[in-house]
């Protein structure tokens, strides 16, 4: 009798173990199927996507220097981004991605500054020194970006990517005006030149901007459908927008832009 009961308990244990194994395999298969459902559209793991989005951001010193006392206005000059990415999934959850993106982006700001080193034009005169007053700046850039990123799938529908990028600028604009203040020529104690709103001084440093910029891109994608996705990304520039020998603005300005849009997966 004891032998029979022992065999019966053993059979129950084996049966329970088989049930657990079957359920585990089923769950794993379902999870794999979900990744396949939202994954690359080819068995090889290769795929590509088209992106279109809105760009918002600007160029900024990091950290904000003491010469900039307050920012009165900030208006992003709503830009666009259009691009194509090619990716290769090396595993169902991670892979690599590279792309070519066109962008047009800019901003307009109005700030209160003190002892802000500037080179300005008033009438036919060029003046350089330290300005205190209101500064209005406009920037705009167009070009192409080549990102190279690692891609990780958090879940079947969510993925994040990060990596370096290299940008080439086709068009560069950096101009503005100063008023409601004064300029000390040469240094903070030099001759004082008053500049009022009715006769502002202007500047244009567009030709002093670099053609090549590099930085880091961080982004996230969410699959809304088999082929359609929503994305958001941040491009953080690592080198300043001006040439290294440009000294009129005596601190570096870095491009910092966010992008949101839609993508179509092939």
Residue ranges of predicted features:
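Extracellular/periplasm-exposed beta-strand and loop segments of Gram-negative cell-envelope proteins
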Residues: 58-77, 105-141, 169-211, 217, ...
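Short glycine/proline- and aromatic-enriched beta-strand/turn motifs that initiate or cap beta-hairpins
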Residues: 30-89, 209, 237, 265
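Outer-membrane beta-barrel "beta-signal"
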Residues: 222-226, 254-266
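Cleavable N-terminal export/targeting peptides
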Residues: 1-43
């Amino acid at each position: 009798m004891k032998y029979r009961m022992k065999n019966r308990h053993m059979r129950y244990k084996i049966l329970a173990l088989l049930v657990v194994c079957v359920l585990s395999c089923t769950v794993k298969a379902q999870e794999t199927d979900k990744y396949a459902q939202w994954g690359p559209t080819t068995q090889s793991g290769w795929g590509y996507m088209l992106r279109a989005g809105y760009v918002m951001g600007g160029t900024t010193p990091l950290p904000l220097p003491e010469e900039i006392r307050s920012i009165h206005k900030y208006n992003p000059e709503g830009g666009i981004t259009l691009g194509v990415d090619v990716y290769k999934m090396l595993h169902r959850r991670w892979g690599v991605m590279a792309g070519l993106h066109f962008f047009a982006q800019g901003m307009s700001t109005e700030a209160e500054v003190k002892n802000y080193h500037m080179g300005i034009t008033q009438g036919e005169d060029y003046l350089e020194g330290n300005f205190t007053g209101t500064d209005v700046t406009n920037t705009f850039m167009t070009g192409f970006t080549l990102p190279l990123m690692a891609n990780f799938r958090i879940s079947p529908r969510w993925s994040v990517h990060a990596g370096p990028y290299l940008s080439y600028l086709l068009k560069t604009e950096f101009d503005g005006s100063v008023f409601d203040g004064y300029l000390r020529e040469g240094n903070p104690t030099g001759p004082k030149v008053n500049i009022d709103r009715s006769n502002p001084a202007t500047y244009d440093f567009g030709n002093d901007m670099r053609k090549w910029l590099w930085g880091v891109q961080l982004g996230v994608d969410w699959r809304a459908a088999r082929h359609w996705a929503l994305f958001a990304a941040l491009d953080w520039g690592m080198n300043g927008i001006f040439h290294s020998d440009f000294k009129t603005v005596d601190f570096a300005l870095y491009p910092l832009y966010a992008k949101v849009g839609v993508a179509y997966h092939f």
